[in-house]
Swiss-Prot record:
GO CC aspect terms: cytosol
Region feature G2, mapped onto this chain: 61-65
Source organism: Deinonema sp
Protein's recorded name: Elongation factor Tu
InterPro entries membership: EF-Tu_GTP-bd, EF-Tu_GTPase, EFTu-like_2, EFTU_2, G_TR_CS, P-loop_NTPase, Small_GTP-bd, T_Tr_GTP-bd_dom
Chain residue ranges for the region called G3: 82-85
Location of this chain's protein in the cell: Cytoplasm
Subunit text: Monomer.
């Protein structure tokens, strides 16, 4: 049941915690909700165990456990995701189930960067998480100031290695557990009353100032995946679909892109729920009437887009999660030359997989980067999500990490 109405007064930003298992991501998430709730009674405080038993959700046919919490700072409203298991992170980031405008990388000061720290940073780079803020957790367990400096240096170097601005991004040191315990003892702990709670505020300040407010979907260039096509006698051809981003107006020029040669046309009408409109915007399900376009010139799987804003491509590097047998995926490995269907937006296109040097095969449950060559072009850009299917069954999920040709 909805808990009150959503007040859209502050800009909305999506964030999440990433980092190695047991470094304190979930404890930090709990501490943030308690910290924000101390000054804003509308925020729901969530204890560790409430976040940890995250509900299952499905994205692109894949089951993922994700906890969603929300909180406000004086300037913004945040949606924050936290995943219980490493596999959930991989799946979440690749499917884009929880799009992040920025991430909080949690590193235990007692252990320094660990294998999943590296993996999550690489994933963030591959799937296009644009900003990272670091929270060095458990500093109360480290007595040696030099050791803390060493860990900070290591984390910064690791981030730079994966093309994040490691030297410049904010690193906040604190203890999520100490802050949470202080807030559980006194839920009204305000800023300036406890040094550990203040570190959480410092983190929130860094997230507020370092992660920019994302561009709204309506401000981006127009794109609409075509779901269906039909003819209106005497008026012409209508393409229907949900506008993914931007705005389209009557008399706009648009390109029809993908699957065949790009064609330019003019929008002569827009309708929604059988009513005529002047424009359609991100989120609207519309029918777009196209001038001089025959019924056979446009098909499901193409996109309508602002001319020059997106190009058709066939070859790309993909970051992929392959479903395990238990998740309904393949029961056996696949090899180079594997030819499944790649489901982009509204249609399947066959493609051939080329594995990286030194990789013989890919097992169910693997997270891997490989090159795909499609038999037909698709309107494509970095960050585009897709499913991998065999005979209509999802066997993997991926994201375009790099467009090649």
């Amino acid at each position: 049941m909805a808990k009150g109405t959503f007040e859209r007064t502050k800009p909305h930003v999506n964030v999440g915690t990433i980092g190695h298992v047991d470094h304190g991501k979930t404890t930090l998430t709990a501490a943030i909700t308690f910290t924000a709730a101390a000054s804003d009674p509308t925020i729901e405080k969530l204890a560790y165990d409430q976040i940890d038993k995250a509900p299952e959700e499905k994205a692109r046919g894949i089951t993922i456990n994700t906890a969603h919490v929300e909180y406000n700072t004086p300037t913004r409203h945040y949606s924050h995701v936290d995943c219980p298991g490493h596999a959930d992170y991989v799946k979440n980031m690749i499917t884009g189930a929880a799009q992040m405008d920025g991430a909080i990388l949690v590193v235990s000061s007692a252990d320094g960067p660990m294998p999943q720290t590296r993996e999550h940073i690489l994933l963030a780079r591959q799937v296009g998480v644009p900003y990272i803020v670091v929270f060095m957790n458990k500093v109360d367990m480290v007595d040696d100031e030099e050791l803390l400096e060493l860990v900070e240096m290591e984390v910064r170097e690791l981030l730079s290695k994966y093309e994040f601005p490691g030297d410049d991004l904010p690193v906040i040191k604190g203890s999520a557990l100490q802050a949470l315990e202080a807030l559980q003892a006194n839920p009204k702990t305000a800023r300036g009353e406890d040094k550990w709670v203040d570190r959480i505020w410092e983190l929130l300040d860094a997230v507020d100032s370092y992660i920019p407010t994302p561009e709204r979907a309506t401000d981006k260039t127009f794109l609409m995946p075509v779901e269906d096509v039909f003819t209106i006698t005497g008026r012409g051809t209508v393409a229907t679909g949900r506008v993914e981003r931007g705005v389209v107006k009557v008399q706009d020029e648009v390109e029809i892109i993908g699957l065949r040669d790009t064609k330019k046309t003019t929008v002569t009408g827009i309708e929604m729920h059988r009513k005529l409109l002047d424009s359609g915007m991100a989120g609207d399900n519309v029918g777009v009437l196209l001038r001089g376009v025959a019924r056979d010139d446009v098909e499901r799987g193409q996109v309508l887009a602002k001319p020059g804003s997106i190009k058709p491509h066939t070859k790309f590097e993909a970051s992929v999660y392959v479903l395990s047998k238990d998740e309904g995926g393949r029961h056996s490995a696949f090899f180079g030359g594997y030819r499944p269907q790649f489901y982009f937006r509204t249609t399947d296109v066959t493609g051939v997989v080329e594995l990286p040097e030194g990789v013989e095969m890919v097992m169910p449950g693997d997270n891997i980067t490989f090159v795909v060559e499609l038999i037909k072009p698709i309107a494509m850009e970095e960050g585009l999500r897709f499913a991998i299917r065999e005979g209509g069954r999802t066997v993997g999920a991926g994201v375009v990490a790099k467009v090649l040709e």
